[in-house]
Design a protein with these regions (language model features):
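Amphipathic alpha-helical dimer-interface segment in Rossmann-like NAD(P)H-dependent oxidoreductases
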Residues: 105-119
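Conserved mid-core segment of classical short-chain dehydrogenase/reductases
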Residues: 83-101
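Rossmann-fold cofactor-recognition segment
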Residues: 48-62
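Conserved Rossmann-fold cofactor-binding substructure of NAD(P)-dependent oxidoreductases
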Residues: 60-73
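N-terminal Rossmann NAD(P)H-binding glycine-rich loop of SDR-like oxidoreductase domains
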Residues: 14, 22
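Rossmann-fold scaffold of SDR-type NAD(P)-dependent oxidoreductases
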Residues: 11, 75-84
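Flexible N-terminal pre-Rossmann segment of NAD(P)-dependent oxidoreductases
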Residues: 1-9
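Conserved glycine-rich Rossmann-like NAD(P)H-binding loop of the short-chain dehydrogenase/reductase
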Residues: 28-43
Length: 119
């Protein structure tokens, strides 16, 4: 797939698969905006990868997401790489109600991403 010149927003893009995707997309010629709720991770990544636009935003903050998407302009691709795997690593019957709630909260975050990111 040719992504040269396309605008890509990556949610959860400061570590793991999200960061690897951001780096690969930028090397392939895409314009990349990479977001994380961690200010520390955003600062570190911006220093290491100045060719990528890193932003601090929480998926539960619709206004923050709106600002991110507006800065990216016309969006060609949205990548959702934000996880929360540490909340769901136990076998099903060993997880607490709170762990289930936290895992399901990711759904609401991604709902906000789609609502704000899709024209």
């Amino acid at each position: 797939m040719d992504i040269q010149g396309q605008n890509i927003v990556i949610i959860g893009g400061t570590s793991g698969i999200g960061l690897a995707t951001a780096i690969a997309a930028q090397k392939a010629g895409a314009n990349v905006w990479s977001a994380s709720r961690s200010t520390d991770k955003v600062s570190l990544c911006q220093t290491k990868h100045p060719e990528i636009q890193f932003s601090q935003v929480d998926t539960h903050d619709p206004e923050g997401l709106k600002s991110l998407f507006q800065s990216a302009g016309r969006i060609n691709h949205i990548v959702g790489a934000a996880t929360g795997a540490d909340r769901t690593m136990l076998p099903f019957m060993e997880q607490t109600d709170e762990q289930f709630r936290e895992a399901f909260n990711k759904f609401w975050g991604y709902t906000n991403v789609v609502r704000q990111g899709v024209p």
